[in-house]
Amino acid sequence: MIQVLLVTLCLAVFPYQGSSIILESGNVNDYEVVYPRKVTALPKGAIQPKNPCCDAATCKLTPGSQCAEGLCCDQCKFIKAGKICRRARGDNPDYRCTGQSGDCPRKHFYA
């Protein structure tokens, strides 16, 4: 049961991109023991679809993509400059997309 939990957590965090996932099913609810280099069945919902912005074989952006993830990335393109990506909290201002990156600017801490 612990092995199933670990494999399920791993698959939920790291999308299935190729044949490197290691799992073989016996007959117990499609979960079973981990065996090297063979995939026969996976729990429903354990595999996330691959990111269309990334080429899994090269680990690079697909042609025409500007970004693959981030609060300022939408459908593989940078979000326009000025869009709020993180609301103000306390004394910190709203953080806005720059239009040059898929990442929301980092929080600034003042002494």
UniProtKB/Swiss-Prot annotation:
Keyword Ligase appears in the UniProt entry: no
Biological process according to GO: cell adhesion; negative regulation of blood coagulation
Q: In which tissues is it expressed?
A: Expressed by the venom gland.
Q: Where is this motif: Cell attachment site?
A: 89-91
Top-level taxon: Eukaryota
Q: Which cysteines are joined by disulfide bonds?
A: C53-C76, C67-C73, C72-C97, C85-C104
> Disintegrin domain: which residues?
47-111
Q: Please list the residues that carry the modification Pyrrolidone carboxylic acid.
A: Q48
Task: Tell me which UniProt keywords the record has, alphabetically.
Answer: Cell adhesion impairing toxin, Disulfide bond, Hemostasis impairing toxin, Platelet aggregation inhibiting toxin, Pyrrolidone carboxylic acid, Secreted, Signal, Toxin
- Tell me the InterPro entries matching this sequence: Disintegrin_CS, Disintegrin_dom, Disintegrin_dom_sf
| Nucleotide-binding listed as a keyword | no
Q: Where in the cell is it found?
A: Secreted
Similarity comment: Belongs to the disintegrin family. Dimeric disintegrin subfamily.
Complex formation: Heterodimer with subunit beta; disulfide-linked.
What's the stated role of this polypeptide?
Answer: Inhibits fibrinogen interaction with platelets. Acts by binding to alpha-IIb/beta-3 (ITGA2B/ITGB3) on the platelet surface and inhibits ADP-induced platelet aggregation in human platelet-rich plasma.
In Swiss-Prot or TrEMBL terms, this protein is called Disintegrin acostatin-alpha
